[in-house]
Amino acid sequence: MATGLRCDGAARQRERGLIVKSDIEAVVRSADLAGWKPVEVEYGTRSFPVLVPGDSRILEMNEVAPLRDPGARMRAALNAPIGSRTLPVILLSKGKPASELTVCITTSDITRPVPYKGDSGILPPLLALLHGAGIRRENVTLIVGTGTHRPSSPAEKVTMFGEDVVAHYRIVDHSCDDAAALVDIGRTASGTEIWINRTFYEADVKIATALVESHFMAGASGGRKAVCPALVSRKTIERFHSAQFLDSPLATNLVLEGNPCHEEALEIAKRCGVDFIVNTVLNRRLQLLEVFAGDLVLAHAKAVELLRSVVAVPLDEEYDVVLTHGGYVGINHYQIAKAAVNALPVVRPGGTIILAACERDDDPIGPLTYRTLLHLLKLQGPRGYMSALLNPGWVFTKDQWEPQMWAKVLDKVGEEGLVYCSAVLSPKEHLIVPGRAGWDYLPADAPEDEMTRARTMLQNAIVYAVKNPRRRGAVPRVAFIKEGPYAVPVRTPAAVRHEAQLISG
């Protein structure tokens, strides 16, 4: 049974609402949790238990065994590509001796755990295959596809690729702002100017490598995303991340068909002439599940098919209260948006999302531009923020897309419907963060230990959301997304049809 809440002073109580705060105190003091069951909630690299109602739905991903011999599977995938000729045959089709061909391999940066080095890595068998077909080492260039990210450090290159590759191959970082390193190859059907990395575009053989995971804007990573946004100009990236594209309901997890972000990136990747891709799918322990090599479209589609079978969680109804967490990837508020967006299919309109956050980054919220835009969202609300972004006079601002994702969350549950439980952010920092602060749920004698404090605020938030007297005796339906940002709840066709009938009837 929870204890009384802290009093932060009259001004603080007026700001957050004295009546609501008193409600919280009364509810957590008197809550009877008989019949509730424990669930383990991830908190950064650790976890802790909290209690949820005994009939709560646990939403979890499928467990898929990793490959027993990932190195052998990597070699087999390269030698039997999907929808494509083998690399040696592709080299023969280029019209000049293999010893004269230039090869460019685009890679992810340090923010993505792509298996590049070692016995189970992409690069050793890929490079061996190229050299065995006559490609000279000095004619191979690795381009780190940074998008708008910073260049990779020498130490990061060793971490990603291994000392041998770093010592013997040319490795460069893409720069989205270096005009001399970009080439204009026209416009997309939607009018986007395509400025692409010159080294990649002018190479005789273009190979794109990546990890395929769910992406809450482009549907899935990998495939075409190794070119756009990874190897294009800032101006092209701004279009890819534009408010107009992201405003589409199809710009979401695991959706490719009709997704404007996916279609734009795919058109750009096709235009620049990708010859071959190597994509991987990992489990949450970063173990290799499968390798997909070959055609830009077909091999990537197979990877997404496997990904969907692993991360998609069938959902037949919406819930009043949804508990989730930021996971290991949630190093700051910017990254934790993934977990909140993944909860959207689960929560009913006007429901409650309770989010456990463990920000471990030096800047627990995010960069200055993100903070500024987040504050704008806080002041104007989701509709006001979107109106600003969609206004013809709006000047594209870096990071504007992430508050747009938070706006989608607030548009469904409201400011009070998002409970952001962070023991890292101070109450002052919470003033610019959307939602209700977990600090409002702490008892007066809250422990100083961060882990215990986080667990206490989360438990009290759950108790209040379930036992809130405003429910007038109604028993709320509760769901827990066990894997947080990694799981992708997907409405079943029956659920979608039922919802459509309710709306029309």
Region spans (language model):
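Conserved, well-structured core segments that form the ligand-binding/active-site neighborhood
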Residues: 166-318, 346
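An N-terminal, well-structured beta->alpha segment
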Residues: 52-93
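Short helix/loop capping segments that flank catalytic or ligand/cofactor-binding pockets
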Residues: 50, 60, 114-115, 208-209, ...
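N-terminal active-site beta-alpha-beta segment that forms phosphate/nucleotide-binding
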Residues: 87-150, 323, 336, 340-354, ...
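Well-ordered mid-protein domain cores that form the structural environment of catalytic cofactors
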Residues: 119-192
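C-terminal catalytic subdomain
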Residues: 333-420, 426
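Active-site segments that bind and position negatively charged phosphate/pyrophosphate groups
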Residues: 297-363
